[in-house]
Swiss-Prot record:
Record's comment on post-translational modification: Phosphorylated by EvgS.
Gene: evgA
Main localization category: cytoplasm
Name of protein: DNA-binding transcriptional activator EvgA
SUPFAM superfamilies from the UniProt entry: C-terminal effector domain of the bipartite response regulators, CheY-like
Keyword hit for DNA-binding: yes
GO process terms (BP): phosphorelay signal transduction system; regulation of DNA-templated transcription
A Pfam family this chain is assigned to: GerE
One cellular-component annotation, GO: cytoplasm
Amino acid sequence: MNAIIIDDHPLAIAAIRNLLIKNDIEILAELTEGGSAVQRVETLKPDIVIIDVDIPGVNGIQVLETLRKRQYSGIIIIVSAKNDHFYGKHCADAGANGFVSKKEGMNNIIAAIEAAKNGYCYFPFSLNRFVGSLTSDQQKLDSLSKQEISVMRYILDGKDNNDIAEKMFISNKTVSTYKSRLMEKLECKSLMDLYTFAQRNKIG
């Protein structure tokens, strides 16, 4: 099997590379940003794509969504040091085969790949957390739409309404609508509240 790694952290890339090579998986390419990722995947046609959520340019979830929309059928494993419930759920919804928390160790990537090869998904959290035992913050995060999540990430990156509108190909008015909705859903009355919420839940 072969793989493409998409991660902007040199140490993470090295750890993933070494892990894959030890398990007889060939590395076709190592990318540090999301802008060229879809094109490279479509050109090289790897069996496996490993993507960090927090890559520059086009983020990991957007790369995942685009690949699935363009009928890429290989194994996609998302890795992140961020909130595993929040990002894991959205990655599952977007078509990832697995989600691996960097905090739990990179070795789980191999477990995720093996699960995907055998027709299973690998998300190391109980689905019961999605329906029965969510914390208040997690319930709020789960209520956000994909568009609201994108707007939130851009806000946390310091982008203003004009920047967000340009990146999402929507109007300033629509950005304001999404912003108002997400602030209401998260019960944040100011941007400082939003930053505090994001820091508390390791989002950003």
